[in-house]
C-alpha cells in the first residue's frame, strides 16, 4: 500500500480504531506508534510481540513487519537475541537531532516561500485562527493536536516529502526522550498533563511563526522555526537535569534504607 505523505500518520493525533481499514501491518504500526508516542511503552521497555499479536488478532510476522518500520523511524530497536525495545536516546544524541532540526529550518523556510500554494496558506491561517480562539476558553486535549497540525501545516507547505519525514522523525524522537524522562521523574507518564504543558509553552512560538508566514520573509520564517527548536531542546536539557537529580536521589535513598542506624549495612 502506497501512503499519501500529505496525510498525517504520526500516530499521536488519535487512537487507532479497532477495525482494520488499511493493511494489517499498517494497523499494527499505528497501534504501536500510538502507544510509544503516548507513553504506554517508554524507552528501554520491551515490546511483547506475542501478547500484542494476540491482542490485535494478527500474526507475529505482521507485528515484526510493523516493528521494522518503527525501527527505521528511530522509535524502536531490534535485538536479534533479546527482542524489540523502545529506543533509548542519550542527551548527546538528542542534541545532535536538534542540530539537524535547526539546519532543516532554513530549507523549510526557503521551500515554503517558493512552493507554498494559496491553499497551503489558507490552511495555516485557518488553524491559527482556531488556536487563537482556543485561548479564550479552558484547555481541551484537542488543542494540543491542533497545535501539532499547525506546525505540520507549515512544513507540509514546503511541499518536500523527504523534508516532511525528517521533521517528524526528529519530533517523534524528541517526544519519546521527554516521555522517558517524565516517567522516571514522576513515576508515571501523565500524557495529558505533558501535552497541556507542551501546548502552553508553544503558544508564543506559534504566534511568532504565523507572523513570519504572513510576512513571507524567508529569514523570519527560518528564525521562528529555529527559536521553537531551541526551546524544545532547552526543555529537554532541563528535564534531563531533573531526571539526573531524581535518579541520584532515589539511589541515595536506597543506600540509606539498607543501612542500620549505626551506619553498617543491614544484616552485616
Language-model segments: which ranges?
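Short linear motifs at protein or domain termini
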Residues: 1-114, 119-120, 237-250, 254-268
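Conserved amphipathic alpha-helical segments that form helical-bundle/coiled-coil interaction surfaces
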Residues: 118-185, 202-212, 218-231
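Amphipathic, non-membrane alpha-helical segments in soluble helical-bundle scaffolds
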Residues: 64, 91-98, 118-121, 164, ...
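C-terminal all-alpha effector/ligand-binding and dimerization domain
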Residues: 2-9, 20, 180-268
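Residue-level recognition of short, well-ordered coil/turn positions
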Residues: 40, 75, 139, 217-218
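Residue-level signal for well-ordered alpha-helical positions
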Residues: 89, 169-170, 177, 235, ...
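Residue-level detector of alpha-helix boundaries and kinks
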Residues: 17, 93, 109, 135-139, ...
Amino acid at each position: 500500500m502506497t501512503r499519501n505523505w500529505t496525510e498525517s500518520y504520526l500516530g499521536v493525533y488519535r487512537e487507532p480504531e479497532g477495525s482494520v481499514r488499511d493493511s494489517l501491518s499498517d494497523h499494527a504500526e499505528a497501534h504501536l506508534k500510538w502507544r510509544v508516542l503516548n507513553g504506554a511503552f517508554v524507552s528501554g521497555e520491551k515490546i511483547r510481540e506475542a501478547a500484542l499479536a494476540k491482542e490485535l488478532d494478527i500474526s507475529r510476522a505482521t507485528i515484526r513487519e510493523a516493528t521494522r518500520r518503527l525501527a527505521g523511524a528511530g522509535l524502536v530497536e531490534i535485538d536479534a537475541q533479546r527482542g524489540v525495545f523502545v529506543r533509548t536516546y542519550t542527551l548527546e544524541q538528542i542534541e545532535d537531532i536538534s542540530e539537524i532540526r535547526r539546519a532543516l529550518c532554513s530549507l523549510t523556510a526557503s521551500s515554503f516561500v517558493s512552493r507554498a500554494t494559496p491553499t497551503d496558506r489558507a490552511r495555516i491561517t485557518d488553524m491559527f485562527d482556531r488556536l487563537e480562539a482556543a485561548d479564550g476558553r479552558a484547555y481541551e486535549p484537542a488543542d494540543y493536536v491542533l497545535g501539532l497540525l499547525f506546525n505540520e501545516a507549515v512544513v507540509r507547505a514546503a511541499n518536500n516529502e523527504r523534508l516532511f519525514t525528517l521533521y517528524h522523525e526528529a519530533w517523534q524522537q524528541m517526544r519519546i526522550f521527554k516521555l522517558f524522562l517524565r516517567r522516571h521523574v514522576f513515576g508515571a507518564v501523565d500524557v495529558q498533563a505533558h501535552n497541556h504543558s507542551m501546548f502552553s509553552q508553544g503558544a508564543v512560538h506559534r504566534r511568532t511563526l504565523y507572523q513570519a508566514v504572513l510576512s513571507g520573509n524567508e529569514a523570519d520564517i527560518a528564525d521562528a522555526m529555529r527559536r521553537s527548536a531551541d526551546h524544545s531542546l532547552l526543555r529537554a536539557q532541563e528535564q534531563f537535569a531533573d531526571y539526573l537529580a531524581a535518579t541520584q536521589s532515589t539511589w541515595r535513598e536506597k543506600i540509606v534504607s539498607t543501612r542500620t542506624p549505626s551506619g553498617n549495612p543491614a544484616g552485616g
